[in-house]
UniProtKB/Swiss-Prot annotation:
This is 26S proteasome regulatory subunit RPN12. One of its GO terms (cellular component) is nucleus. The keyword Transcription regulation does not apply. Residues 76-251 form the PCI domain. The lineage of its organism: Eukaryota, Fungi, Dikarya, Ascomycota, Saccharomycotina.
Amino acid sequence: MPSLAELTKSLSIAFENGDYAACEKLLPPIKIELIKNNLLIPDLSIQNDIYLNDLMITKRILEVGALASIQTFNFDSFENYFNQLKPYYFSNNHKLSESDKKSKLISLYLLNLLSQNNTTKFHSELQYLDKHIKNLEDDSLLSYPIKLDRWLMEGSYQKAWDLLQSGSQNISEFDSFTDILKSAIRDEIAKNTELSYDFLPLSNIKALLFFNNEKETEKFALERNWPIVNSKVYFNNQSKEKADYEDEMMHEEDQKTNIIEKAMDYAISIENIV
């Protein structure tokens, strides 16, 4: 069995190389060793420089675990790692509480809650953070999920969409939640549209739901069982049946007109013969 130091070194190399699957394999035996050495859960009553230094290393291990979990879309694992980091990040020990990854991981945790539509816990956590971190929104990373939540609550979907489209401030881990949150925005707009309209032109739906083309819009409409008739999207069967009936009536009128025209042509031809 490799030592804790050897396992930690292998973890660091795997993470730097972007081998997140290897990170996930290394982390369980590392956590076992941390538990054996009373390091996984910090005992802040121990005021020993060596122990505190070991806790700093443990914090970095947990941060790697959290970030690797995001990269592999293992959000349950990410949440577990973040909860294990909380005693460090919100410790009274300044050295333990500081980290260059702290703002990023807190933001990812808040985005994870938003992606689950867990707004109650999101706002509860926000209140907790507000007590422990001054001027939350002055931090460019922390302000990202806060703005997103505010605009979603206000129904300012264009602003929320633009923020998601902005490339998540070049934080690649944020992109793990982008598609989920975009889908949530589309679903919310779709629900409101269904309640407000009987039908809308396909081109309007494309613009409303931020689609790039009508083919994507048609696919979305069919997934929601929205009938499409003559480039119009219908949101209830009654409206669709009415559209079908009107379409059928127009077709019958065209047929009648065609028959009458043929009859008139025939009558004129007979008259000319006589």
